[in-house]
Amino acid sequence: PLPGGDKLQIYLLYTADWVATGAGYDNRIGALWISPATCQPAGSVIAHEIGHCFQYLTYCQALESGAPDDSRAGFRYGYAENAGNALWEIGAQWQSWQSYPEEMFTDYEMETWFQQYHRALENEYTRYQNYWWFYALTEQYGLDAYSRIWRESAYPEDAYQTFMRLYLANDLNAFYDAMYR
């Protein structure tokens, strides 16, 4: 965080365009950029972007704790050659539903999920829809399990690998049991 303890800055942009972006600055502070159009009404979109701010802050906190500035904590790294990381969108969506659960089943993302539910957690096709694993994870291991997955990720793990290391002693059969209960 910046001197004085600021951890999040919110910018309301004077524009007629629709703007909603959550991230941060200089690996030190979370930031949210929104426009009036995204605030009327405030809802899961704003909560989703605030989720990205929290995700960004995970890396900032790792740096404060002495981690090297190499983008290898807090899932700051991407997967494979395209450097994509659907987990950021999946996690932000899950975080938004914590504040706006009534939108979870009415949101247009549900239709996409029903068409794509056979895909793996971090598949790019379901980057906004596949938040169900986080519900199962937190129901089984507590709400802190979500933040532990983020805080204790280790490059080049994906979320499943971090989960296996933290909760299942890297036992693949235990992972299969956990996934198919």
Predicted regions and their residues:
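Amphipathic alpha-helical segments within well-ordered protein domains
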Residues: 134-135, 164
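Stable alpha-helical elements in mature extracytoplasmic
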Residues: 42-50, 87-91, 95, 130-133, ...
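Short helix/loop segments within enzyme catalytic domains
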Residues: 96-116, 141-155
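Active-site rim elements
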Residues: 79-82, 117-124, 135, 148-151
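Juxtacatalytic substrate-recognition/specificity segment
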Residues: 1-84, 92, 102-103, 119
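Catalytic-site signature segments of enzymes, centered on catalytic residues
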Residues: 108-131
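Soluble non-cytosolic domains of exported or imported proteins
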Residues: 37-45, 82-86, 124-128, 139-140, ...
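Beta/coil-rich, acidic/histidine-enriched accessory regions frequently appended to metallopeptidases
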Residues: 157-181
